[in-house]
């Protein structure tokens, strides 16, 4: 059975690492043929570019950023499944401004699923950018960081 490579960029370790590690550990429980590559975005991306023979890939992006459009195209062209779990977002009304809707729908076409923090964000997307649902799937999942707080 061919290995699936699961890429997990993590640049702000103090904020993101524990939550990303929980994601990795929960995946390991259910999938046996997966190899994880976790590190800074630069390190992870360099590994992908260097290893052109990898066929099955999953990339857990930290959010959708138009600066990385060419990178998303590169990953999609290689057959990589791209998922997003933003590390910034609002779960409270006062944080609503943290959610950016300045997203290129061409990028959304390349992203398999977007995991979002709250119903508040989901409802904002429905209200302001309903057309996003024509390009990608959005699921309210919360963030593993909150799971760490509850245990």
What are these language model-derived features?
Residues 4-151:
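Active-site and donor-binding regions of nucleotide-sugar-utilizing enzymes
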């Amino acid at each position: 059975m061919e290995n699936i490579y699961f890429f997990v960029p993590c640049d702000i370790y103090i904020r993101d690492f524990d939550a990303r590690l929980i994601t990795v550990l929960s995946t390991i429980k259910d999938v046996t043929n997966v190899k994880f590559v976790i590190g800074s975005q630069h390190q992870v991306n360099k590994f992908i570019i260097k290893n052109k023979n990898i066929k099955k890939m999953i990339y857990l992006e930290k959010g959708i950023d138009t600066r990385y459009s060419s990178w998303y195209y590169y990953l999609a062209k290689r057959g990589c499944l791209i998922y997003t779990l933003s590390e910034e977002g609002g779960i409270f009304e006062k944080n609503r401004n943290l959610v950016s809707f300045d997203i290129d729908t061409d990028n959304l076409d390349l992203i398999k699923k977007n995991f979002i923090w709250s119903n508040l964000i989901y409802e904002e997307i429905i209200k302001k950018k309903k057309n996003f649902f024509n390009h990608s799937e959005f699921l309210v999942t919360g963030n593993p960081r909150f799971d760490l707080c509850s245990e």
